[in-house]
Amino acid sequence: MNSYFEQASGFYGHPHQATGMAMGSGGHHDQTASAAAAAYRGFPLSLGMSPYANHHLQRTTQDSPYDASITAACNKIYGDGASAYKQDCLNIKADAVNGYKDIWNTGGSNGGGTGGGGGGGGAGGNASNGSNAGNAANGQNNAAGGMPVRPSACTPDSRVGGYLDTSGGSPVSHRGGSAGGNVSAGGGGQSGQSGAPGVGVGVGVGVGAGAGTAWNANCTISGAAAAQTAAASSLHQASNHTFYPWMAIAGKIRSDLTQYGGISTDMGKRYSESLAGSLLPDWLGTNGLRRRGRQTYTRYQTLELEKEFHTNHYLTRRRRIEMAHALCLTERQIKIWFQNRRMKLKKEIQAIKELNEQEKQAQAQKAAAAAAAAAAVQGGHLDQN
């Protein structure tokens, strides 16, 4: 495919080879109207650089009847002379730039809202028409002022920003300029994207008087705009996190602790514990973190677990997996249940032992008391004799 474009009769033709590099490196200076029109026609859409691998090679320009017709049309529209196509992004005026009317930076009463579709449809107010041809680089909206409209691309690199809407105000984005807030819809697909005329609907919403902003007023993003973009992205990332009620309570505790800077560590702990005991609900811990709730078992699950525990106090891995599938529980839940059940059994056995010992002690005390009473009775009989 590259070899086809590198041939003498490539798709874009050699006027792009000869003059496209001059536009990318040396700017728009010292070019004839025909060379500028050919380079503007041949510049690939949505590309800020030449797609050719050997773009540094200079080749002879071959004129064709098609180039001649394009040159004549450009001379008729933009006027003759080398200064007709010169543009400078750094010297943008309020109303006109180098003889071209800046419709993107006007907030007057006669500026209609421009279409946001492919080539941009004609808007309300005094905006006349929106043209969208197949090979046109972008739609041209001629205002009623009589002055030719400035082309949309300020530099080859800015066209990429125009289609990607990186500058926030490209012709493709929602920009207007009419005082009455006119809404316009213009036909036409994306301009210059295909060889055939595009079909689509573009909708432009007019902004209030003086509120329209120039989409190409700044070729580079300023430091304030970059900082605002970074702040907006960080805010968007922070909004993705889920907020729970306990976060507000925990944040209140931390803010109260930081408010009193003289509180020592121990005093801060006691203060947080007192707040936790008074403000936090039962299912929240002292540090504001959620405690895991108790697992409730159904009667069927408890019965099956008790039967298995009666058979064997310790489960193998295989048996634990089988019971987990049978009772719709996890292995961890069954493991913890058996641990708790063994601890409960141990406590029960210990309690039984203590009861047995207490009974033995009580029986021993009773036997001792009975023996003492019998001895006392026997001693009394001996004294009487």
UniProtKB/Swiss-Prot annotation:
Q: Enumerate the SUPFAM superfamilies for this protein.
A: Homeodomain-like
Q: Which residues bind DNA?
A: 290-349
In the record, which residues are listed under signal peptide?
Answer: none
Pfam families for this protein: Homeodomain (PF00046)
Tell me a Gene Ontology molecular-function term this record carries.
DNA-binding transcription factor activity, RNA polymerase II-specific
The residue ranges flagged as biased composition, category Gly residues, are 177-194
The cross-references to SMART domains, in alphabetical order and at most eight, read: HOX
Compartments where located: Nucleus
Record GO cellular component, one term = nucleus
Give the domain of life.
Eukaryota
Motif (Antp-type hexapeptide) spans which residues? 243-248
Residue stretches of biased makeup (Low complexity): 132-146
BP terms from Gene Ontology: anterior/posterior pattern specification; negative regulation of transcription by RNA polymerase II
Location of the region described as Disordered in the Swiss-Prot/TrEMBL record: 132-194
InterPro entries per the record? Antp_homeobox, HD, HD_metazoa, Homeobox_CS, Homeodomain-like_sf
State the UniProt keywords alphabetically: Activator, Developmental protein, DNA-binding, Homeobox, Nucleus, Repressor, Transcription, Transcription regulation
The family classification in the record reads:
Belongs to the Antp homeobox family.
Question: What is this protein for, i.e. what is its function?
Answer: Sequence-specific transcription factor which is part of a developmental regulatory system that provides cells with specific positional identities on the anterior-posterior axis. Binds the consensus region 5'-TTAAT[GT][GA]-3'. This homeotic protein controls development of the cells in the posterior thoracic and first abdominal segments. It activates the synthesis of the decapentaplegic (DPP) growth factor.
Q: What is this protein called?
A: Homeotic protein ultrabithorax
List the source organism: Drosophila pseudoobscura pseudoobscura (Fruit fly)
